[in-house]
Curated annotation (Swiss-Prot):
Signal peptide: none annotated. InterPro entries: NADH_Q_OxRdtase_chain4, NADH_Q_OxRdtase_chainM/4, NADH_UbQ_OxRdtase, ND/Mrp_TM. This is NAD(P)H-quinone oxidoreductase chain 4 2. It comes from Microcystis aeruginosa (strain NIES-843 / IAM M-2473). The lineage of its organism: Bacteria, Bacillati, Cyanobacteriota, Cyanophyceae, Oscillatoriophycideae. One of its GO terms (cellular component) is plasma membrane-derived thylakoid membrane. Its main location: membrane. GO terms for molecular function: NADH dehydrogenase (ubiquinone) activity; ubiquinone binding.
Amino acid sequence: MLTANFPWLSAIILLPLLASFLIPVIPDKEGKTVRWFALGVGLADFILMCYVFLQKYDLSNPNLQLVEKIDWVPQIGLSWAVSVDGISAPLVLLAGLVTTLSILAAWQVDRKPRLFYFLMLLLYAAQIGVFVAQDLLLFFLMWEIELIPVYLLVSIWGGQKRRYAATKFLLYTAAASIFILVAGLAMALYGGGAMTFDMAELGFKDYPLALELVLYAGLLIAFGVKLAIFPLHTWLPDAHGEASAPVSMILAGVLLKMGGYGLIRLNMGLLPDAHIYFAPILAILGVVNIIYGAFASFGQQNMKRRLAYSSVSHMGFVLLGIASFTDVGISGAMLQMLSHGLIAAVLFFLAGVTYDRTHTLALNEMGGIAQAMPKVFALFTAGAMASLALPGMSGFASEITVFIGVTSSDVYSQTFRVVTVFLASVGLILTPIYLLSMLRQVFYGDGSSCDITNILPNKSNEQAVCFGTSCVLPHESEYSDAKPREIFIAVSFLALIVAIGFYPQLATRIYDVKTVAVNSEVRQAYTEIAATRQNIYAETQPDVSAKVASIFQ
């Protein structure tokens, strides 16, 4: 554990937080100044975190680094305890990149710009707080704070059903997060002594197996909602379908990853014994997510809802990796979170770019867009190839790593591994089907046989641009392809996707030392339980069905 000489992590959190409260007092009538201010703050914070991790972070150290701990409210055991390790560091960088580029993507926001950028910076700070908090109560507070800006960003700047989608998101996530608070209180109070929510100290406690199972189940619900695990996923398509593109970039690129992070940090890290019993369930849920998400995505005729269900499918690989009991599998789960964060962000951004021109997300109303927007077509195609795990893209590296982790696991029976990999492969086959069909519906064809729809008043039909079955009138008198700002955002994501695809160690070297340490603790717990609970583990390699059934005994 390395204590920081300077509060670097606090600075990374407080910079966007304090800057957000300056926005209301900045003199600006048209919102142009606050736009540049928010972008400058986001970029400065991202540069700061890059400097900290390049100069102050030791990649070879699996322990917590840059540790800061101050007794904040000692009466209830709350402390300002923040630090990073291999699990949190890459996700902090992901949050910084995605949020900064989403601010740039929101450049045309002209409705209540002060409030919009205030909420974006507040969300920026809360995201970082979730990933660096090492006090469970502080983690819960950051988790809750993050809900407020997301709710407002969706409900104010969303589509026609924005209030319904925002309320559904809030109810799902707020209700589920209660389990985090309950689990924290139970662990803090167990064993007597001074109350503490410090995760390191909570990890040293020896909880009864029955208590661990209950706490694990509660945390699984809380993180399962955020990770969009079936059947807790239904808020996600609605939220993405109604949220603006910059908000969808953060929802898919960062917020989903909080669920996976929580499973690794708390469920595996603090409750390794319970993880032994729940791991097969996670593997089964992962397969269900992969297949269900793929089928559901193919059935969507709204572009953003199709991408949302594809996220449900891709998060199934995170569950498989976490459940694998192998170093390679957990590494693949981390790589999948990072890869999907980049891929989902660029796809939702390009969906927003397309909507800005066509004013529709209905796939059956599009067609032939490639002729009018060749640059967007090229960028969208590259993003789709990454999502369907084309070799040379980060999606391929992450998913093949998860498969290797599952197949090489010595915990599950051969039958279980073969069936799991086979069913997950079905999802891989379905992925190009729903993505390539979306590309065909949106970009291919000539768009010649269309009915003109005057969606803007006082405009001539001669200014219409035709797509598929309808023609629309863009905001500008002349139709335009992707602009330099939009190209820069998309290329920034795609460059990283390709770089990680060709050289995965760009990402894996950040966290592999830590994921090996986490898996080592789980493997040790597995060995101890297998030696003492012969009624559950018939042999060194346990029977999975008995393992799952034991949970309900």
